[in-house]
A protein has these predicted regions:
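Short acidic, hydrophobic short linear motifs in intrinsically disordered regions
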Residues: 237-241, 248-262, 287-291, 445-457, ...
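Intrinsically disordered, low-complexity regulatory segments
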Residues: 1-141, 149-150, 214, 409-413, ...
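C-terminal or mid-to-C-terminal helical accessory/interaction module adjacent to the motor/catalytic core
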Residues: 113-197, 242-246
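Basic, low-complexity terminal or inter-domain segments flanking catalytic cores
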Residues: 2-5, 16, 25, 151, ...
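Metal- or metallocofactor-binding catalytic centers and their adjacent structured scaffolds
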Residues: 217-253, 426-432, 439, 544, ...
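Short active-site loop/helix that positions an aromatic residue
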Residues: 16-20, 92-93, 172-179, 361
Length: 782
């Protein structure tokens, strides 16, 4: 009989923990949840206090049988799933499904995978916290109710196969509203005036000092008048102020701040950051990665202090205690930090090393002294004028935490870097001026959200929790309500007036403005679904309501509220809204926009959501003749497309001519513009316009695709037509019966025989679950 069985969530964690505990302990993994609500059924008995109907998925049944047998033969079962609500629910499901007994079942938690933390957890077991379980169950059931009841409404009113979620829908609303703010934004111009003054330095050498007018000038005429007033004027140092400035280090990382900073500094997506953090945690390098706490343990602060003294000296040490400001913080008891502060670097992939370095620096910085700076501001008066210029300089007296870490920010602005030193100045000093430049600048529209800034906004609104940010952002993109992309900048004209040697020069320049990278854009489907839900289910889309639901989950977790009564209150209001909305009949399809009339047929022209996305339509379903449809082009929006642009779409597909005796045509499909020749689709490059592409250009694209296909297909076998050796993005591989298999680097693909291919497939199929190289092939796109 096995003395002790420990069950954790992941196999990687199991191997590490088994080494710490020794031969009396066997550690197995549950691979996450072992049961859940039934996928294709509602699975909630509303009339019986919202009783959930759980099932063990088919792919977990063998695992559950193994865990049952091992638990039955163990003297003590230790449930060691993660310490958040999700982890507590996993422990409870294991207890229920494995039919464990209270007398020999112990619940243990730890927020780092180190020997001392594991042994301490074994010494301090506790019972399963049913309040945390109920909070998780309430979230799961409420989200199932919303998704299961709203989705059919969307299928009937908007488009089949759409789905809705409580937190996801609010995230989409934020992105839609920001997009509309951007489109509604009216740019205002004003002139920013800067001057270069020539000032002697300590050696008497003339150096340039830049200063800026303290106000913006609204019009070109006013700017010109100001420069004219500066001709022959005297510029004098009216005042000099010097003040000390302290900069305090930011708190250690929570889940959301790590996601934001990793995006800014490393360019990682939210999902990528969480995947890497999970690996670091399971390898024992960092503490638990789903947390909204900024606290550090005494062990961490002492370790930080020792590391700082060793590397930088005692004057850099300033132990601090940070308080968690997030209301309802509950996911863990400590911030994300390295398990051992003396480990400045780790072994791992390049991405893991970068993320660890970021976490280490942020943690160390939080326990370091303030940065001490000195800021000097000189005010420069203009004779005969009330306006003044100011010149600002900043010098670091003691770098403190800046020695290791500088926080990044999302918003770019036009502020000058003040970390320059001003030359020696004295009050009353007259200044010789060089050029004075009035540059036309423009107010900036609100920026689109990045994944990181969306996480920050959700956290500010109290929506979601550390465990939900990454799944929310992934889900809204997978459902094609939002897409992440880049936007090319637009050329803009701006005016510059320069006063130099008593002469004013008037010039126009151009600049590229509005370029954006990796931003979140709402799709037409996302906009239509958002507008529909906002109109008919305002509560679900209300920020305060969604945040209040999170607070109610917190109250359940703290034992201050009954989860069933909260479910009842919600359902009694929500369910009638669903039934009422289904009963409403609308004249037009939800989201349909009438653009005008087709001048040829006299029929109405509209845009709406079709089966494969937004389409333009001529005519209606009531006409004798079937309506004509045209797929909208990428970059076009249902909200902004004009009648003329919609009519242009009906010129596609168009025939370009013949090539090799077959017709060549160009059109726009579900995946964008294409050339079609002999039943083969070729995607158009980004710069190519389907309305202007020539037959010669299309022929070149056809030949390029053929060449790529020839390079892709390395080898076939007549006796086994389903097996082929292909050259893919990550190198050569075997494809066979819908699955892909890696070819080892030391093997030349062309030298493989059918027999050796089948042997490679057999070896890879026999590998343990979770380590197999076999992958299902994705369906091909046109």
């Amino acid at each position: 009989m096995q003395k002790n069985l420990v069950i954790v969530e992941s196999p990687a964690k199991a191997k590490t923990i088994e080494k710490f505990l020794g031969k009396d302990f066997k550690v197995l993994s549950s691979y996450g949840h072992i049961r859940d609500l039934k996928k294709k059924e509602f699975s909630i008995d509303v009339k019986k206090d919202f009783k959930p109907d759980y099932e063990i998925p088919a792919d977990k049944k063998a695992l559950v049988s193994t865990l049952k047998a091992e638990a039955k033969s163990a003297e003590t079962v230790w449930l060691a799933s993660d310490e958040d609500r999700e982890g507590e629910a996993i422990a409870w499901h294991l207890y229920e499904v494995l039919k464990l007994k209270p007398e020999n079942t112990k619940r243990i938690v730890f927020h780092e995978i180190t020997k001392s933390a594991i042994l301490k957890a074994i010494e301090r077991p506790r019972n399963i916290d049913l309040n945390l379980v109920n909070a998780q169950q309430a979230r799961r059931i409420l989200d199932r109710i919303v998704g299961f009841e709203l989705s059919p409404v969307l299928w009937r009113k908007v488009k089949p196969v759409l789905s809705a979620g409580r937190v996801q829908s609010v995230a989409v609303r934020l992105i839609v509203e920001r997009e509309r703010e951007i489109h509604a934004f009216k740019t205002e111009a004003a002139y920013r005036v800067t001057a270069i003054f020539l000032v002697p330095d300590t050696d008497g050498k003339s150096v340039e000092m830049k200063a800026e007018l303290t106000r913006r000038i609204k019009t070109k005429e006013e700017a010109k008048a100001f420069l004219e007033a500066c001709q022959g004027a005297t510029f004098t140092i009216e005042d000099i102020t010097t003040r000390p400035v302290k900069k305090t280090p930011p708190a250690p990382f929570t889940t959301s701040t790590l996601q934001q900073e990793a995006a800014r500094k490393l360019g990682y997506t939210v999902a990528q950051t969480m995947m890497l953090a999970q690996r670091l945690y399971e390898s024992g390098f960092i503490t638990y990665m789903r947390t909204d706490s900024v606290n550090l343990s005494d062990f961490a602060t002492i370790g930080s202090k020792e590391a700082i003294i060793k590397m930088m000296g005692e004057n850099y040490v300033h132990p601090r205690h940070f308080e968690t400001k997030t209301k309802g913080a509950q996911e863990a008891h400590e911030a994300i930090r390295p398990t051992y502060m003396e480990n400045q670097s780790i072994e791992g992939s390049a991405q893991e090393k970068k993320l660890y370095d970021l976490i280490w620096k942020r943690t160390i910085a939080s326990q370091m002294a303030d940065a001490e700076l000195e800021k000097t501001t000189a005010t420069i008066s203009i004779s005969g004028n009330k306006d003044v210029f100011t010149a600002t300089g900043e010098v670091i007296k003691f770098d403190g935490f800046l020695h290791v870490y500088r926080e990044s920010y999302d918003d770019d602005n036009e502020q000058e870097d003040e970390s320059r030193l001003l030359p020696p100045l004295k009050k009353g000093q007259r200044l010789e001026y060089g050029p004075i430049i009035a540059t036309e600048r423009f107010t900036q529209r609100p920026p689109r959200y990045t994944e990181a800034s969306l996480v920050r906004k959700l956290e500010e609104l109290g929506i979601g929790r550390p465990s939900t940010y990454a799944p929310t952002i992934s889900t809204i993109q997978q459902r094609e309500y939002v897409e992440k992309g880049n936007k090319d900048g637009e050329e803009r004209l701006f005016n510059v007036l320069t006063l130099r040697e008593n002469h004013i020069k008037d010039e126009n320049h151009t600049e590229i403005t509005g370029a954006e990278k990796a931003k979140l854009f709402p799709t037409d489907t996302g906009i239509v679904v958002n507008d529909f839900l906002t109109e008919y289910f305002p509560n679900i889309l209300d920020y305060n309501f969604t945040a209040s639901v999170e607070k109610e989950f917190d109250e359940i977790a703290e034992g201050e509220a009954q989860w069933t009564s909260i479910m009842k209150t919600f359902y009694d209001k929500f369910h009638p809204s669903v039934e009422n909305t289904l009963a409403i009949k609308t004249e037009h399809k939800v989201g349909e926009r009438i653009l005008g009339e087709d001048p040829v047929s006299g029929k109405p022209v509209s845009v709406k959501i079709g089966r494969f996305g937004p389409v333009a339509q001529i005519g209606t379903a009531d006409d004798e003749e079937k309506p004509r449809f045209a797929q909208m082009k990428k970059g076009q929006s249902m909200e902004t497309i004009t009648l003329e642009e919609a009519l242009e779409l009906f010129k596609l597909p168009r025939t370009l001519g013949e090539y090799e005796g077959k017709t060549v045509s160009v059109g726009v499909g579900r995946f964008g513009p294409y050339v079609l020749h002999n039943k083969v689709y070729v995607s158009l490059p980004k710069a190519a316009d389907p309305m202007t592409i020539t037959l010669e250009e299309a022929e070149q694209l056809i030949l390029e695709k053929r060449q790529k296909e020839m390079e892709r297909h390395l080898k076939k076998f007549e006796e086994e037509p389903e097996l082929e050796i292909l050259n893919g993005r990550y190198g050569p591989y075997i494809t066979y019966k819908g699955s892909n298999y890696k070819i080892p680097k030391d093997i030349v693909p062309q030298d493989l025989t059918l027999k050796s291919c089948l042997e490679l497939i057999k070896v890879q199929n026999e590998k343990e679950p979770g380590t197999t190289k076999k992958k299902k092939t994705a369906p091909k796109k046109k």
